[in-house]
Amino acid sequence: MPDLTGRTALVTGTAHGIGAAIVAALEAHGATAHGVDKDTVDVTDPGQVAGLIERIGAIDILVNNAGGVCGQVGQAVEDVSDEDWLEVVDANLTSTFVCTRAVVPAMKRAGRGRIVNISSGAGRSVSLTGIQAYASAKAGQIGFTRQTAHELGRFGITVNCIAPGFVLSNPTTIRQWESYGEEGQRDLVERIATRRLGTPEDIANGVLFFAANESSWVTGQVLSIDGGQAIF
């Protein structure tokens, strides 16, 4: 596993689940990891993000994990308000842009950097109905990953993306799982090659791979960590 001693990491969306597991994994491998959530820093606000970077200093590893459906599930497209749309797009995509823009200058000066964006299987293919903004923002995050990887590779900065499958990582995913009932839960697990749901640690292990020195020739990639669900 990678040795990240001396590296400084910033992880967004760390109140629980995947974000918290990523912080723990980075620290376990030697990095100094700073986790933030919406209660401490609004990562869609350039001023707040700039202030955070000023306090922390140069960032070697950025993990853009902030996001979520913001309670918007099962809405017909005609019922999605402008405010609803922007809330989800800002939380998932704008935050990725704002944080990436903030850390890149120091990464360029250092001649090295690792950026990992946490997208979703919903950004790669059709998912639940009624999550139009979330799926669109996550697809946009994948596009942003590829564009910035192409732009920043010459500076020693890699940009990659992880698309998690079904992970019981927060109250929203737990409620979603419970809403399926026993039959629906069995059907979902049967569509996963490994026949189990994911854990936050599964996603954190993918981040460790992309953050490692050994992954310096891997950039612009989207890694599905979904137990093989995407192959069905």
Enumerate the language-model features and the residues they cover:
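The beta1-alpha1 cofactor-binding region of Rossmann-like NAD(H)/NADP(H)-dependent oxidoreductases
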Residues: 39-51, 82, 201-202
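Catalytic loop of short-chain dehydrogenase/reductase
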Residues: 69, 116-140, 145-154, 166-167
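Substrate-binding pocket helix/loop in short-chain dehydrogenase/reductase
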Residues: 73-77, 81-89, 177, 188
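A short, exposed helix-loop element centered on a Lys and neighboring polar residues
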Residues: 100-101, 146
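Short, small/polar-rich loop/turn modules that mediate ligand/substrate recognition or access, typified
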Residues: 153, 158, 163, 218-220
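A glycine/serine/threonine-rich, flexible loop-to-helix segment
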Residues: 166-192
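Short C-terminal tail/terminal secondary-structure segment
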Residues: 207-208, 219-232
